[in-house]
């Protein structure tokens, strides 16, 4: 008999295997290891979910099902379906199984007869098939061709095409095939196949048909599974397709829509699986993706709360079985629900024992914490141990016949592994527990223990300022909401061809060709691929090829009749449609590293791309390691004075400063608040005797004492010897701050300090009076290179120069634009490091990608070569606090600092003289009662005097003696750096090279990399004194304080700080010479003298901590060519820099050393001189090529033409007189110079060559009147010519004759300040000026260029634990990492133990005179006498003994600071004090470090238009603009000064005869005129806009006037033509200005593709441009034209809207209105213009942001519906929302969850441009107390 026991899910901690019997059972039941029987879902593989052509969704086997809201899902297949796939996809890693099951739930069309599924081999032979219809056929043919077609198993008497649902299971086991129909009928047939049959998996699987078959399956199908286990067919109705009335059991089935419902006991152990054909009722639209692992399935498809999720590896238990299991009225066995697909069978082999699945897989360890109940049997019966009969035993029974029986009469021996008819039918499902399918291998894992309690709050961290303790990286945050899509970037370059995709599905079979006459054999060009190796990826043959092969083979099989004549070639059928993409193959193994490619030639220079929009700032990276200290850079520009910083921590004590003069006594401060009572102080010294007090009341009469003898007053005793040194007392509390001690004696004059750094340059002072001209100075050293000037006028194209010598390798280019950011990929295996590839071209800037996780920090790179000294950088951001620097030289004594905090108690100073009596302090707290002291001597009774008035305070005591010299203070802070060193000695003279032609100034080179640490330079000479600074502004007047009590006059204070300089006074009269003064005290240290000779090298100091990188210096001198270094790794592509302005030409450089000989160039024939070319666009720098090998010196080449002007060289020694350089651009106007001395008269020059005709001369003196000419016609008014290009300056003329002095002109008005002239050559050194005052802090320099890319950022926070990955192969051991950077100092450690007592101190000084000794023994008390009369006051008695400590007095004056005491041990932290009053507002602190970038804030309202900004500084000279239209003729100018006489003209030919004029009055005969020049009368040259015709040269014999008129007329015509040409050009290519608007932004982009995004003027309706309006052009998005909502339409702040009704339009709100739109200047856009803009646009786009608090904007995630979605009213009065407009989508839908503050961003991107912009919005989800919303309306953008 079976004894059933069960495993109960143990409580945590309960032992699971408590009996040895269970262990024995586990050992007996251990199954043999077997491969997992993983069902393969053919419908999933054929992509039924995406409904391919001919497939639709329909209701499945069950219209309703218990515990499920939705019906089963099935697929209706029509004749149009063409579905096939390579068999390899079904079994990618293995062969087709010998024994298997085919399971399907199907409803075939009534009366049909077609194959449901067919499997073909590589040659196109059908190997497997299932035909549905009357008498179904199971077709099977193995690799040996067995069984033949006549032996295929046939199942007569069964009709599967009756139009009803059937559950069909076919089990193929050895040489039997069993059909189980509808869980009732079982028919077994003999299958005469070979002993080891093979089904080829290199062919294809067709669904619903056979190749060349006319019959195609039509009907509905819900499931079609292949299982690699023949026993799965017997479980079909329990595990895969249960009955409709079967409730969803406790089994962890994949269909469970709500896993919580099946655990009434609340254990919360849930499994999550997917089932592909039953829709999740909570999300009907979801199509779950298959997954290979149950754990991953749960993670990928559903979010399950943490407490409920459990990995599905715990063993579920067995279903309930009973005797009724096989009855026809209850075909479902047990309470099984829908069967899972891949997920469920991932690790589950079938066992060869009964339903008790309680034994682990031998590979798995046992986990005693399993939470499942497993029924076990204590008896090992034949039911659970006998294997199925072998085929030999069953052969005679089965034979060729088949047995037909119902399931209840199953052969027990055959079926008993699955069915136990003797099982206890009384076992209830609750006892058995959650069911476990028979095919689930059990893996026991622990149930999680109960959640621990929250731990106690940790101690607060001790983090000091500037200390950064890096925590462990946090868990990865949840994925952020997807950002709104960026604007469309420019089209990228064509990518590399992708890998070949998987083969598509086979196409439709072609139509039959017409039968042709006999002909040649057709050879189809198929590539028959041989079988790949095991593990090769994907099928070797495409699906189309397999299908064609199958067609051929099928045709061959069909032609089994007598051979007919050979047919002609038939027409090929049409190509079927491409199949859908197959599943992507697994990633291939990494191939071996390929050989390094040859360096490609540099590509052609691309056109410069448009400048991308600036990306948003990245997160701030961690500061990199401090680089080595660089060379001292040139002084940068002075920064603006920063805001006042926080008060720094008190620095270490500086050396004692020079004693200052006594300051004046300050006003008395206000009385401070009363302090807390202090602890009782130590016993004070005996105070001076106070004034006699008032008489007290008579005391109580005491007891009479025994009369004692009255002793005489003894003489005062001598002071005793000094006592021994006592032990040091306990450390006292810190005393109060002592008073400032008297100034010490003046110390000896210290050594002059090191010269300080030159101060920041002050602003230029006012110009001084002009001094007398100095004597001519000697040739000064060449000055520093001046700033790069504005570009001069474009020069004439120079002739080609000599070919230059080969240059050294260029510096690294700047980074390119960042590319598109990709999604974060899966972390791949660590590959081998490949060789660096060649640098690619710069890609266009992509839109900003989603922020990826921070990468791991990279390894430190090797130190680069020392770079050249760069240009001075601009001030960078403040760095993080660096490590403590090394101790610098002692600085100068600083100014008196503010009062420091209380110091540690000093050692006691020498005793000062007694000060005056202080006023009586307030009463202190009661002290501790002291021990009774010894009795003092009785004093004489003094009479009580009347209380005297309080006397005045005594005078201040004399100043104490100066104290001893204090110990040396700690070293001061680092001094300022020294002045720049002198120029080094001149290097060795190089070989004199041939003089190179002067070159053109090149653009500024890229910034060099940080060089290694240079040697410290020598200190430079002191700079010139700065000019007088401007006076500062006066401070605000403070509030008047309360008058304090009158103080005593103090000693003179130290001199105050130097005041600001006053306004410059008028010059006073010259005073008389004074008397010689006496010798003054030694002055302050003078300016540093010139450096002495270099001393011997000192010992090498320790390597200092690396300093912060200094500012970028200017370019240093070019170093000699270095040895080629090892090739570094490929750097990142640099960004194209903006072209800098062309600098002014520098002076001619020194003769350079001869370069290396270059290759010989071939001698070309000289070309003709070309005309001047247009200015080309600046191309981006090409990639730097590799350094070539040094060539052999070639033969000397022929002299080439002079090259272009070279770059400005460094200043060398003065060379010989160079050849004349190019004329420089005109400099700014200089100051008026003094008149020069008259020059000597020069010699008469030679007669020059004939020059070109000069400009018209001035009007000459009147000649003798000529004969009257004829009357000419009146001339027309000509247009002025266009402005000519500026000619090059002529050679200097000879000095003119000195003119007579003119009269003194009137005083001119004060002129505006002229522009700064260029730097003059360095003058001779002037006399040493007085040291100037420190100027105010300079203005801040301009913002610096972006720095080099920072080091990699700190590792980002760790992400959430991802799904466990597969274990990777062991990696190769990594290289030894470079040592990490030095860690920052940790927090202060705990106080150390108290040290041993120190050595005995030095012997003390001799003590002062001791107090009076103690009295003698006490005598007996005498009786109290009567009170006598008040006597006269007696003499003051001797000092009594020290009394009891008196009350605490007021705080005395601060004592002088003692020397530093040793630091005491660290005390325990005190209790927190009471909260103090809030202090005054502190000064503004230093700007903090730049924080991490916060999340983007909500869009703010558009601000009001700001006030006009201050006048900006004049910008650089712009590029030459388009020539403007001719202006109107100006008024005639005044006659010019007479010019010099021109050269004699050449003889001209006689002009044409003019018309005869009227006879004039006869005049005097004049002298004959000079012959004139012939000038072309018609300057018809369309390209010239400047006329070289001089009207004075046209006058010849009075007949030239007609020519003048004619020429002037032509000039007017040409001016008009030029204007027309400009206007036509602007019409063709509008500029987007108000006078020349474009039609749309798209038009503007087409004409000017290089324009940046911004505001431009458009005029969509064209015509007059006065109605144009200004829009925002988004060229990055392809040329969108954007208009904005007006200020009141931009949106509304988030609020609860209590008075508004949900479902009403915003325009009906009290604060609402219809939305209206304006242009970029705030003017409304006209309706007509908007209409034309829409006509010119193909699509329109607008974003709306809904800011919510627990309010839905679009989808309601709780219900999955869009009932509460916002509705919009378009410009065409059309309502738009989710239900009627597919062009609205949610870019971000944070409001769907109704959790806290969120936002939803909706985008309308519609081709119906008349809908945009929206004019009204309807909101529906608000009104409850906890709901709020606001919204923001974005611009409407139209794209043409």
Curated annotation (Swiss-Prot):
Residues 231-445, 1573-1607 are annotated as: Nonhelical region. The modification 5-hydroxylysine is found at residues 629, 644, 710, 746, 776, 797, 806, 809, 812, 821, 848, 866, 884, 899. GO terms for biological process: blood vessel development; cell adhesion; cell migration; collagen biosynthetic process; collagen fibril organization; eye morphogenesis; heart morphogenesis; integrin biosynthetic process. Residues 1-30 form the signal peptide. A high molecular weight form was detected in Schwann cells and peripheral nerve. A lower, probably processed form, is detected in all other tissues tested (at protein level). GO terms for molecular function: extracellular matrix structural constituent; extracellular matrix structural constituent conferring tensile strength; heparin binding; platelet-derived growth factor binding; proteoglycan binding. Residues 839-848 have a biased composition (Basic and acidic residues). Residues 1296-1305 have a biased composition (Gly residues). Residues 1611-1839 form the Fibrillar collagen NC1 domain. GO terms for cellular component: basement membrane; collagen trimer; collagen type V trimer; collagen-containing extracellular matrix; extracellular matrix; extracellular space. The modification 3-hydroxyproline is found at residues 682, 688. It is found in: Secreted, Extracellular space, Extracellular matrix. Transmembrane segments: none annotated. Residues 72-244 form the Laminin G-like domain. The modification Sulfotyrosine is found at residues 234, 236, 240, 262-263, 336, 338, 344, 1603, 1606. Prolines at the third position of the tripeptide repeating unit (G-X-Y) are hydroxylated in some or all of the chains. Type V collagen is a member of group I collagen (fibrillar forming collagen). It is a minor connective tissue component of nearly ubiquitous distribution. Type V collagen binds to DNA, heparan sulfate, thrombospondin, heparin, and insulin. Belongs to the fibrillar collagen family. This is Collagen alpha-1(V) chain. It comes from Rattus norvegicus (Rat). The gene is Col5a1.
């Amino acid at each position: 008999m079976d004894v059933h026991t069960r495993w109960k899910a143990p409580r945590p901690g309960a032992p699971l295997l408590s009996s040895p019997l269970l262990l024995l059972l586990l050992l007996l039941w251990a199954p043999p290891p077997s491969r997992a029987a993983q069902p393969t879902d053919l419908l999933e593989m054929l992509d039924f979910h995406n409904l391919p052509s001919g497939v639709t969704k329909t209701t499945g086997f069950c219209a309703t099902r218990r515990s499920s809201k939705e019906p089963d899902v099935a697929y209706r297949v029509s004749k149009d379906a063409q579905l096939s796939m390579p068999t390899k996809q079904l079994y990618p890693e293995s062969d087709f199984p010998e024994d298997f099951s085919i399971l399907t739930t199907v409803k075939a069309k009534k009366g049909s007869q077609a194959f449901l599924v067919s499997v073909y081999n590589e040659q196109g032979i059908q190997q497997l098939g299932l035909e549905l219809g009357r008498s179904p056929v199971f077709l099977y043919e193995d690799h040996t061709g067995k069984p033949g077609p006549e032996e295929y198993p046939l199942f007569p008497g069964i009709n599967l095409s009756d139009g009803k649902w059937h559950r069909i299971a076919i089990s193929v086991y050895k040489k039997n095939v069993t059909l189980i129909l509808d869980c009732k009928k079982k028919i077994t047939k003999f299958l005469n196949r070979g002993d080891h049959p093979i089904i080829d998996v290199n062919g294809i699987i067709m669904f619903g048909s056979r190749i060349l078959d006319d019959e195609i399956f039509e009907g509905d199908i819900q499931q079609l599974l292949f299982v690699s286990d023949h026993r799965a067919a017997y479980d079909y109705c329990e595990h895969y397709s249960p009955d409709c009335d079967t409730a969803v059991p406790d089994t962890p089935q994949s269909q469970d829509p709500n896993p919580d419902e099946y655990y009434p006991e609340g254990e919360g152990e849930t499994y999550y699986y997917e089932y592909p054909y039953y829709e999740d009722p909570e999300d009907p639209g979801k199509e779950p993706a298959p997954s290979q692992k149950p754990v991953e399935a749960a993670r990928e498809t559903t979010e399950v709360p943490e407490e409920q999720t459990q990995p599905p590896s715990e063993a579920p238990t067995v279903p309930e079985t009973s005797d009724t299991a096989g009855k026809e009225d209850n075909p479902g066995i047990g309470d099984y629900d829908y069967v899972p697909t891949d997920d469920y069978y991932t690790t589950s082999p079938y066992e060869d024992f009964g339903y008790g699945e309680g034994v682990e897989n031998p590979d798995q360890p046992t986990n005693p914490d399993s939470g499942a109940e497993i029924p076990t049997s204590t008896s090992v019966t034949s039911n659970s141990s006998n294997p199925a009969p072998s085929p030999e035993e069953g052969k005679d029974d089965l034979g060729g016949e088949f047995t037909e029986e119902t399931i209840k009469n199953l052969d027990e021996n055959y079926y008993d592994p699955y069915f136990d008819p003797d099982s206890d039918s009384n076992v209830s499902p609750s006892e058995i527990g959650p069911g476990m399918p028979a095919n689930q291998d059990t893996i026991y894992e622990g149930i999680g223990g109960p959640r621990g309690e929250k731990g106690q709050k940790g101690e607060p961290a001790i983090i000091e300022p500037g200390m950064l303790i890096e925590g462990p990286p946090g868990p990865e945050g949840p994925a952020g909401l997807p950002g709104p899509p960026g604007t469309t970037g420019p089209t990228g370059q064509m990518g590399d061809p992708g890998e070949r995709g998987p083969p598509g599905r086979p196409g439709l079979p072609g139509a039959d060709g017409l039968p042709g006459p006999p002909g040649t054999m057709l050879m189809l060009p198929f590539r028959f691929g041989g079988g790949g190796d095991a593990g090769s990826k994907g099928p070797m043959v495409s699906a189309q090829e397999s299908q064609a092969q199958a067609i051929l083979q099928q045709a061959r099989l069909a032609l089994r009749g007598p051979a007919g004549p050979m047919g002609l070639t038939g027409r090929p059928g049409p190509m079927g449609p491409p199949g859908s993409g197959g599943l992507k193959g697994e990633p291939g193994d990494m191939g071996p590293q390929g050989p390094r490619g040859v360096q490609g030639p540099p590509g052609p220079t691309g056109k410069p791309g448009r400048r991308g929009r600036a990306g948003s700032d990245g997160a701030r990276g961690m500061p990199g390691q401090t680089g080595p200290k660089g060379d001292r850079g040139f002084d940068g520009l002075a920064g603006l004075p920063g805001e006042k910083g926080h008060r720094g921590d008190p620095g270490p004590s500086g050396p004692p400063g020079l004693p200052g003069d006594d300051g004046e006594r300050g006003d008395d401060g206000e009385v401070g608040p009363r302090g807390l009572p202090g602890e009782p102080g130590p016993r004070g010294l005996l105070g001076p005797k106070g004034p006699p007090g008032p008489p007290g009341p008579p005391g109580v009469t005491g007891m009479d004492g025994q009369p004692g003898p009255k002793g005489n007053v003894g003489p005062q005793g001598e002071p005793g010897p000094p006592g021994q040194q006592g032990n040091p007392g306990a450390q006292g509390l810190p005393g109060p701050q002592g008073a400032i001690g008297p100034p010490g004696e003046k110390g000896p004059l210290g050594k002059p300090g090191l010269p300080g750094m030159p101060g920041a340059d002050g602003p230029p002072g006012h110009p001084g009076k002009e001094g007398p001209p100095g004597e001519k100075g000697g040739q000064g050293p060449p000055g520093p290179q001046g700033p790069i000037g504005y570009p001069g006028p474009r020069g004439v194209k120079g002739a080609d120069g000599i070919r230059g010598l080969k240059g050294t390798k260029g510096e690294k280019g700047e980074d390119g634009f960042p590319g598109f950011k990709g999604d974060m990929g899966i972390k791949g295996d660590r590959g081998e490091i490949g060789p660096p590839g060649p640098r690619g071209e710069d890609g266009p800037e992509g839109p900003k990608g989603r922020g990826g996780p921070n990468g791991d920090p990279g390894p430190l790179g090797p130190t680069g070569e020392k770079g050249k000294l760069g240009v001075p950088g601009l001030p960078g951001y403040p760095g993080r606090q660096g490590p403590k620097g090394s101790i610098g030289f002692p600085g100068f004594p600083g100014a008196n600092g503010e009062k420091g905090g209380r110091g540690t108690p000093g050692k006691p100073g020498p005793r000062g003289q007694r000060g005056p009596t202080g006023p009586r302090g307030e009463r202190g707290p009661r002290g501790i009662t002291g021990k009774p002291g010894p009795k003092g001597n009785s004093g004489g009774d003094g009479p009580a005097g009347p209380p005297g008035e309080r006397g005045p305070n005594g005078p201040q005591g004399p100043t104490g003696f100066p104290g001893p010299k204090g110990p040396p203070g700690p070293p001061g802070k680092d001094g300022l750096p020294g002045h720049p060193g002198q120029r080094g000695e001149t290097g060795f003279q190089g070989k004199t090279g041939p003089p190179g032609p002067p070159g053109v100034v090149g653009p500024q080179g890229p910034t060099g990399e940080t060089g290694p640490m240079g040697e410290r330079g020598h200190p430079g000479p002191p700079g010139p004194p700065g000019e007088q600074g401007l006076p500062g502004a006066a401070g605000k007047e403070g509030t008047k304080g309360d008058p304090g009590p009158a103080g005593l006059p103090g000693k003179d204070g130290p001199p105050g700080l130097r005041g600001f300089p006053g306004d410059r006074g008028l010059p006073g009269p010259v005073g008389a010479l004074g008397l010689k003064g006496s010798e003054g005290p030694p002055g302050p240290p003078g300016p540093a003298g010139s450096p002495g000779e270099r001393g011997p090298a000192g010992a090498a100091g320790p390597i200092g901590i690396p300093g912060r990188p200094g500012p970028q210096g200017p370019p240093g001198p070019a170093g000699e060519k270095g040895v080629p270094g090892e090739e570094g790794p490929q750097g990142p592509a640099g960004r194209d820099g903006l072209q800098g302005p062309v600098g002014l030409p520098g002076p001619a450089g020194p003769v350079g050393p001869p370069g290396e000989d270059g290759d010989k160039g071939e001698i070309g024939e000289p070309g003709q001189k070309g005309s001047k070319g247009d200015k080309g666009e600046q191309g981006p720098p090409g990639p730097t090529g590799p350094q070539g090998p040094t060539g052999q010196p070639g033969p000397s080449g022929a002299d080439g033409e002079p090259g272009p002007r070279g770059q400005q060289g460094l200043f060398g020694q003065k060379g010989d007189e160079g050849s004349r350089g190019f004329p420089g651009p005109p400099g700014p106007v200089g100051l008026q110079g003094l008149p020069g001395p008259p020059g000597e008269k020069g010699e008469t020059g030679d007669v020059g060559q004939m020059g070109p005709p000069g400009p018209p001369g001035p009007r000459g003196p009147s000649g003798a009147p000529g004969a009257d000419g004829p009357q000419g016609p009146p001339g027309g008014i000509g247009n002025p010519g266009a402005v000519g290009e500026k000619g090059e300056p002529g050679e200097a003329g000879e000095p003119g004759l000195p003119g007579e002095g003119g009269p003194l002109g009137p005083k001119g008005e004060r002129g505006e300040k002229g522009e700064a002239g260029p730097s003059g050559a360095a003058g001779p050194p002037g006399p040493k000026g007085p040291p100037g005052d420190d100027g105010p802090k300079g203005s801040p320099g301009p913002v610096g260029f972006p720095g080099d890319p920072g080091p990699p950022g700190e590792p980002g926070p760790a992400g959430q634990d991802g799904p466990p990955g597969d274990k990777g192969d062991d990696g190769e051991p990594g290289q030894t990492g470079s040592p990490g950077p030095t860690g920052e100092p940790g927090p202060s450690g705990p106080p150390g133990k108290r040290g041993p007592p120190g050595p005995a101190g030095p012997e003390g000084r001799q003590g002062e005179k001791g107090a009076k000794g103690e009295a003698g023994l006490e005598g007996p008390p005498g009786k109290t006498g009567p009170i006598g009369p008040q006597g006269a006051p007696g003499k003051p008695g001797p000092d009594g003994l020290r009394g009891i400590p008196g009350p605490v007095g007021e705080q005395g004056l601060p004592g002088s600071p003692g020397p530093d005491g040793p630091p005491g041990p660290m005390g325990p932290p005190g209790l927190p004090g009471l909260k103090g009053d809030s202090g005054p507002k502190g000064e503004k602190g230093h700007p903090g470090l730049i924080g991490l970038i916060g999340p983007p804030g909500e869009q703010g309202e558009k601000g009001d238009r700001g006030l006009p900004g201050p006048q900006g500084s004049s910008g650089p000279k712009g590029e030459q603009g388009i020539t403007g239209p001719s202006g109107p003729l100006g008024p005639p100018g005044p006659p010019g000064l007479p010019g010099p006489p021109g050269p004699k003209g050449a003889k001209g030919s006689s002009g044409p005869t003019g018309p005869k004029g009227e006879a004039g009055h006869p005049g005097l005969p004049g002298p004959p005129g000079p012959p004139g020049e012939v000038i072309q009368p018609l300057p018809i040259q369309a390209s010239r806009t400047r006329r070289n015709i001089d009207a004075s040269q046209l006058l010849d014999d009075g007949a030239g006037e007609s020519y003048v008129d004619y020429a002037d007329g032509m000039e007017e015509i040409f001016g008009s033509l030029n204007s027309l040409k400009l206007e036509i050009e602007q019409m063709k290519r509008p500029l987007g200005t108000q006078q020349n608007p474009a039609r749309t932004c798209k038009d503007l982009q087409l004409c000017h593709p290089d324009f940046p995004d911004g505001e431009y003027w458009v005029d969509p309706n064209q015509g007059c441009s006065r109605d144009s309006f200004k829009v925002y052009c988004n060229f990055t998005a392809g040329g969108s034209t954007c208009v904005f909502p007006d200020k009141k339409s931009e949106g509304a702040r988030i609020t609860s809207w209590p008075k508004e009704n949900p479902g009403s339009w915003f325009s009906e709100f009290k604060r609402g209105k219809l939305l209206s739109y304006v242009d970029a200047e705030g003017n409304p856009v006209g309706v007509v213009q908007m209409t034309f803009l829409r006509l010119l646009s193909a699509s329109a786009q607008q974003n709306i942001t809904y800011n919510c608090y627990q309010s839905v904007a679009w989808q309601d995630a709780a219900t999955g519906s869009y009932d509460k979605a916002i509705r919009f009213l378009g410009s065409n009065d059309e309502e738009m929302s989710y239900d009627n407009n597919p062009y609205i989508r949610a870019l971000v839908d944070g409001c769907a969850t109704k959790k806290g503050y969120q936002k939803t961003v909706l985008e309308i991107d519609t081709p119906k441009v008349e809908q945009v912009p929206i004019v009204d919005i309807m909101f529906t989800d608000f009104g409850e107390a906890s709901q709020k919303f606001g919204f923001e309306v974005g611009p409407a953008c139209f794209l043409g």
